[in-house]
């Protein structure tokens, strides 16, 4: 393509006509004058600003079209907001509910950073962000937006930059800063930053695929993303005394305490993820006869039901049925059920009068057990049984820490990592990366093994 860097941009000219005033942007390219008329000064200003920005970036102009080369990619003819909606719809049916929520939050933040003007006083910034997150970037709900939300989104549509803004490195940095920060300006967690940047990267790769951008403008290479660690914080692990106190308090809880005690005991003794436990049915529990000498049983883990919210699932349910994490859709795993857990589950099933086709841990009305109920009970148990210092610490802060404690106990009890990985639904490398720091009690034996190799002979 023939290009030139000889560009001169004139001021905007206006001309009154019978049908209204026309605002024209004029610029000279290699001795040839180009003109583009607009119906409003704002549109003319926006277009002229793009031309000026291109010259400041040192961008070449096409002598055939008169436009910067970035315009030939289609970036200037597509608004950011329009493209973000298109990307949302393209991703909706290929992603999970939680991924949809994350994508919506990232696009909301990016859109706020890519507005051409400040939010007017007539619009509430909080309501505007809610409109973007809950309606604009939600394929199912967009058409259901109430009038006030639709009006706010119309304002966003009119006041967003074009996709050409992604060809300005300073604006790209502004967006990256926005998705790396909380509303108060403080930096968010490294894992959140990494996840948000991953969404942006997928979106920009899609823009390249759709010929909206020529290249992905996100910086590449070492140091561009924060370092993250997947290792378990040893301070979050629960010892046997603390676990007994926590589960004992839950068992004595008047409302649903016995059911929740069995739920937490399953996590502590068998290590499934919370979303796997809520998805279990009575038929997934294989218990020996009460009179059998061997009281070991088995748990069949084959489904997960993460709680994502009714607005983000295909059928409007709060939970979304999925296969096991990192496994094929129809895969499953078998986990041993130690005698202590066998006793708890047998009593639970008999007390609740559960049938094989019933959920193992149903809610009060037979529905799937709500995450809010689980988290509220666990928080109350921590508050009532731990010291103020322990309660303020990471000790058992999340329900998930029961799983981490179980897997750590298995490793410390000498169960081979490959077997623990199979029971936990992890790969061995991931298991060791997450839990290796928590393996203790083997140092004395390891020292003896090293010494058994012998020292160098005296010469």
Regions found by a protein language model. Name each.
Residues 184-199, 213-280, 292-296, 320, ...:
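Basic, Lys/Arg- and aromatic-enriched nucleic-acid-binding interface segment
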